[in-house]
Amino acid sequence: MSLMIDVESLKVGATTLIHALQLEAHRGVVHTLMGASGSGKSSLLAAVCGTLAPALEFNGRVALDGELLDHLPTERRRIGILFQDDLLFAHMTVRENLLFAVPPGPRAQREALVQQALHDLELPGFGKQDPATLSGGQRSRVALMRALLAQPKALLLDEPFSRMDAGLRSRMRDFVFATVRSRDIPVLLVTHDEEDIADRAHLTRLPAPV
C-alpha cells in the first residue's frame, strides 16, 4: 500500500504554492515534507484528506493503494490526520475520546480495543480522567492513538511536535515513528525541523511559492 500524490498545481488566487510535484509515501515509511512558511505544506495535506479551503485550488491526483481519492468525501478516504494541537474533546474522558474513534462493532470488542490502546500508551488507569489533567506529552500520545484507532489506511502528521520542548519532542518523535511503523501504513509528515526527518531517503523539500 502506498499514498501517491501528483500535484499539477496548488494555488491561492494568482499565487502558485506548489507546481509539478510528485511524491509517494510507502507502507511503513514516514515520508517527510519540508518547506518555508507559506509554501503550501499544510494546504497539500488538506487536499489529500479532502478538507481544502474553498479559496485554494488543487489540480492533480491523490491515490491510495491505486484507488483515486480525488472525488471521494473526506470520511470515505480513510486518511487520518494529527495536528500540532491535540484537539481532544474536552467534554469527554480519555476513554471516551479513544472510543469515539473506534469503528462500529460489538461494544465489548470496542472497549477491549480502547483498553489495549491505553496499555500501549503506558496510560493504564487513565481512562476515566479528564484530558485537561494530562501532561502535554500524554495528550499528544492519546491524540495519536485516537487517530490510529479509526483504522486509517494512511496518516498525515502536520507539525505534530512543534509546540513541545526539546526533551519531550525527542521522546514523542520516537514514540510516533515507532507506533506508525508498527501499523505498516504510509505516513506523510510536515515539519520545519530538520531533526524531525524520519528518513532522508524519503524527503521532499518544497520551493518557495511563485
At which residue positions do the language-model features occur?
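ABC-type ATPase nucleotide-binding domains, specifically the catalytic core motifs of the NBD
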Residues: A53, P73, M92-E111, D120
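A short, proline-enriched helix->beta-strand linker immediately N-terminal to the Walker B motif
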Residues: L149-K153
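ABC ATPase NBD coupling module
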Residues: E67-Q84, P104
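Hydrophobic anchor residue at the start of the ABC signature
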Residues: L144
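Conserved ABC ATPase "signature" region
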Residues: Q109-F126, F177-A178
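Conserved ABC ATPase signature
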Residues: D130-L134, Q138
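Catalytic Walker B motif of ABC-type/P-loop ATPase nucleotide-binding domains
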Residues: L155-E159
